[in-house]
């Protein structure tokens, strides 16, 4: 439904990242389990500097590095929208949509209703990094070296999990192995 509203308001003249970002952001507002959520992989993308700059976010959908990066583009777009709303208000989004409908380029519309892109990018990076660092702070998100634990040896993984009970990789792998055995 959100796509219908935004596309009508912009006369179908809006970049995919902004359309998807608004929709995923709205999904999360409606219900916390809806929409793209932070994941260990997204956390790593953010902390490893793999976010696409806001001014080039359309490229994340057009030429992604991998299928995972396409999914991350949805999430990143939604947190850009979240950042805009938190820092510049909901009117900022509405004003950008209006300008897009008048043929204004997205980056110009953002600068007119939020901040210069360089300053916006700086603030957004701090915001996204904060979200990433706050994600599962008690979890061990490191993937062990294959020499440390053989990823093909189910018993070795269980043993390693017993020694590292908060390790997400070991938990996920053990669960997947148990499901496979069923």
Model-predicted regions and their roles:
Residues 1-6, 22:
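Active-site His/Glu-centered metal-binding helix of metallohydrolases
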């Amino acid at each position: 439904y959100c796509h219908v509203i935004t596309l009508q308001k912009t006369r179908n003249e809006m970049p995919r990242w902004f359309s998807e970002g608004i929709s995923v952001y709205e999904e999360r507002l409606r219900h916390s389990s809806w929409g793209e959520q932070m994941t260990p992989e997204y956390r790593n993308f953010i902390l490893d500097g793999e976010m696409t700059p806001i001014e080039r976010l359309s490229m994340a959908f057009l030429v992604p590095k991998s299928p995972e990066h396409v999914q991350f583009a949805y999430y990143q777009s939604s947190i850009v929208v979240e950042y805009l709303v938190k820092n510049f208000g909901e009117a900022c989004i509405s004003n950008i949509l209006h300008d897009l409908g008048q043929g204004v380029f997205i980056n110009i519309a953002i600068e007119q209703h939020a901040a210069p892109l360089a300053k916006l990018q700086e603030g957004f990076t701090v915001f996204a990094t904060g979200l990433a660092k706050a994600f599962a702070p008690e979890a061990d998100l490191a993937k062990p070296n294959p020499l440390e634990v053989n990823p093909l040896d189910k018993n070795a993984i269980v043993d390693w999990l017993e020694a590292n009970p908060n390790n997400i990789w070991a938990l996920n792998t053990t669960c997947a192995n148990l499901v496979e055995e069923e």
